[in-house]
Amino acid sequence: MGQTLLDALNVRVVGSGERVLVLAHGFGTDQSAWNRILPFFLRDYRVVLYDLVCAGSVNPDFFDFRRYTTLDPYVDDLLHILDALGIDCCAYVGHSVSAMIGILASIRRPELFSKLILIGASPRFLNDEDYHGGFEQGEIEKVFSAMEANYEAWVNGFAPLAVGADVPAAVREFSRTLFNMRPDITLFVSRTVFNSDMRGVLGLVKVPCHIFQTARDHSVPASVATYLKNHLGGKNTVHWLNIEGHLPHLSAPTLLAQELRRALSHR
């Protein structure tokens, strides 16, 4: 990249606390998804925010279709950011695909992470004989076809489903960041995410994990949270949130912030 990775991915460090908290956004959003969560943590933490390279807030020229074919290059980006900032230990909050990025990063560099908080995490979206991920292959292919055929129509249908709760402002916000993404990048990343299978590495995670599972998440059924609890290698806790949908930081930020503070203070 012509400019540094920190500039390219819009890395920011805000807050005045001694402890470091990383907030990593998920698919279809950017770091602005944390805006209503952020005020709850600025006094007690130095908060690191950044955009995934696929986010609409990042220059699409930085997205290398030959490189970002798995989640590993996203892990490289995260670890590069932490090293460049001189961070030797942090608590990490990852939503959606960033939950899995955090899991992979903690396997590579466990000393960097005091705990992982995983929101809407899924190691695999496709169903198997002994695993309910929530989607059949045919359903996923229909999603890809809909994205290719008419991106605007797909966003207008997908955003309310993902938000789940009847919170029009959250639907508008998620739609905005989806529309900011270049459609070919959205489709490419969707294929990467939906076709990934991280179940085999879960046992390698030794960092304590807090699994946040909302009610009626269109993308991640409750059984996935139970699967994570049973297969992650370290100490872990499931937090069943009385919030609907896949994006609680948009639809119920105050409630989520309270749950995050509780998990962060848990020893």
UniProtKB/Swiss-Prot annotation:
Keywords recorded for this protein, A-Z: Hydrolase
Active site positions: 96 (nucleophile), 217, 246
Enzyme Commission code: 3.1.-.-
Disruption of the gene: reported phenotype: Increased shoot branching.
Signal peptide (UniProt feature, chain positions): none
GO molecular function annotations of the record: hydrolase activity, acting on ester bonds
Keyword flag Cell division: no
One of the GO BP terms on file: secondary shoot formation
Gene3D superfamilies: alpha/beta hydrolase
SUPFAM superfamilies the record matches: alpha/beta-Hydrolases
Keyword Hydrolase assigned: yes
Enzyme class: hydrolase
Family matches, as InterPro entries: AB_hydrolase_1 (IPR000073), AB_hydrolase_fold (IPR029058)
Family named by the database record: Belongs to the AB hydrolase superfamily.
Subunit structure: Interacts with MAX2A in a strigolactone-dependent manner.
Function: Involved in strigolactone signaling pathway. May function downstream of strigolactone synthesis, as a component of hormone signaling or as an enzyme that participates in the conversion of strigolactones to the bioactive form. Can hydrolyze the synthetic strigolactone analog GR24 in vitro.
PANTHER family: ESTERASE-RELATED
Name this polypeptide is given: Probable strigolactone esterase DAD2
